[in-house]
Amino acid sequence: MKTCTCLIRATFWQLRGVVPEYRYPDQVIFNLSAVCLMRGRTCLNVRKRGADHVILPGGKIEPGETPLEAAIREAREETCLVLDPADLTHLGTFDAPAANGDADGICCAVYVCDWQDSWPEPVPDSEIVEYEWTDLDHCHDDARQAPLLLGRVIPALQQRGLL
């Protein structure tokens, strides 16, 4: 039941006559988790092989994993960074249109973590072909940016005073 909170929230508002900002299509991927690695007013995005959009490091939550554990695992797999759970703050769980065609929409738990100067810059590999430090103040006109970042993460960062 917990995995469907975004869908339940959207249905709640629809039943009350409020049109949500994002309507769920037929195919939605739930159980996603991602990390917004912040360096100043930028965040690290990745572009996977064959993808058009850059996205936050993240992916599907495996059976038996918590969203936090999945975020840490995905960050390690995609950036080679070993993150300390104490350094991650849950920003929220957000619904958004999918960026790269695996589905029509997503529901994703997002965690924020400050970049440490001692960490090495990630290097592209067979899965991740590009890393990009996205300037969060000037990315709204960039068609390569994922709807999750533009429509959900940036507003949440601003609301919390993190941007």
For each feature predicted by the language model, list its residue ranges:
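Conserved beta-strand segments that form the floor/walls of ligand-binding pockets within enzyme
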Residues: 55, 89, 110
